[in-house]
């Protein structure tokens, strides 16, 4: 355990950000009884150094939080595996499988490695293996599984209820062409 005077004085970014989070989000974590941080993964390609860096930075934040406050923490690594396959990565076999499935959700695209049900599942498993090799402590969640379990239903209903307000807020931030097709349900 690091001396509290050092924790409060350091300008090391994980501690600076952790101090802000602990101060600004106190009501939330006291209500929930824990602090949850999240990383995101777009499984249209294999995990890489950027994936590692995001989880490493988040882990540094968790470690700093643990020095500041005695509260349970967790990291959720969330895979956006319902994203559409926009392009074919250079480092995959059986490219013709992917060519036939462009723009489909990654968990609906067959695995070109022929090891899993889908390309999304393959890359999710590669991510978990990658993170486990570095002994990261995380909870894995899949967009596909979360949708199928209905865990987004409340939020989706709220988006539907606030549809026009959301569009009014977002449309001015988009280019003219994107403004024509934007929907909160199809960002």
Give the residues covered by each predicted segment.
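Non-catalytic terminal extensions that flank enzyme cores
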Residues: 1-49, 63, 67-77, 90-103, ...
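The substrate-binding groove and active-site-proximal loops of carbohydrate-active enzymes
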Residues: 5-8, 43-52, 105-118, 144-148
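Active/ligand-binding-proximal structured segments within catalytic/core domains
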Residues: 50-61
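Short, solvent-exposed beta-strand-terminating loops
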Residues: 80-89
